[in-house]
Amino acid sequence: MLTKRIIPCLDIKNGKVVKGINFVGLKEIGDPVELAKIYEEQCADEIVFLDITASFEEREIIGELIGRAARELSIPLTVGGGIRSINDFRRILASGADKVSINSAAIENPEFIHQAANEFGVQCVVVAIDAKANESGSSFEVYIKGGRENAGIDLVEWAKKCEKLGAGEILLTSMDKDGTKTGYDLKMLNAVCSAVNIPVVASGGCGSISDIIDVFEKTKSDAALVASLFHYGEATVDEVKEELIKNRIPARIIKKEII
């Protein structure tokens, strides 16, 4: 089993970290750069910044925030939200991000994935997918515009297409689970993980360390995105990793030298 990644996710609105339930009822948590620095000290593997209103309101992400974070962090930074064009993609990377996450624009123009992969390399291209179960619960549907609009696309078919077009990673968020703290959507994750060969990052629903253990033991997810658990101080990244290792799940831990 490859080393599993723990990735704190910072949903950003108007330059502040926020958190809600099922994509609504947002509460302000704090400054994204300061939180990211804390998580890096706790041995986070990567950081994700998602501007959760940029796509819907068609706003551009402020490069200054990305630049601040890039200067302060030594771990990879993924940034998403409002990425509409190759120029947007280029600007985010130039600001200091290591990867760029695209969502709505990829569905509206799938060739965007191919163009980005060709110009910047597949390692920079993350396709974020927001999905929820259909009415019968038999399959999953993709949503865009920050989860506000049904794209009318089957999740598994879209994930396969993303891989074919050049996505280096899929960031899969369960809208049904988002913010509920009832555990990841294992059924959804298994459906996608079994259909693609690129890394899948699990997102939406983490409420405890046991939920993270479950997602790695019961799915082939490569990484777990975590928000509320860390933002509200219910656990630290290093505490999560210690429990993973106790459960024979490989995780990266850097031992701090005592001076």
From Swiss-Prot:
Heterodimer of HisH and HisF. It comes from Lactococcus lactis subsp. cremoris (strain MG1363). Keywords: Amino-acid biosynthesis, Cytoplasm, Histidine biosynthesis, Lyase. It comes from the Bacteria. One of its GO terms (biological process) is L-histidine biosynthetic process. HAMAP family: HisF (MF_01013). It is an enzyme of class 4 (lyase). IGPS catalyzes the conversion of PRFAR and glutamine to IGP, AICAR and glutamate. The HisF subunit catalyzes the cyclization activity that produces IGP and AICAR from PRFAR using the ammonia provided by the HisH subunit. This is Imidazole glycerol phosphate synthase subunit HisF. Its EC number is 4.3.2.10. The lineage of its organism: Bacteria, Bacillati, Bacillota, Bacilli, Lactobacillales. GO terms for cellular component: cytoplasm. The keyword Amino-acid biosynthesis applies. InterPro entries: Aldolase_TIM, His_biosynth, HisF, IGPS_HisA/HisF, RibuloseP-bd_barrel. One of its GO terms (molecular function) is imidazoleglycerol-phosphate synthase activity. It is found in: Cytoplasm.
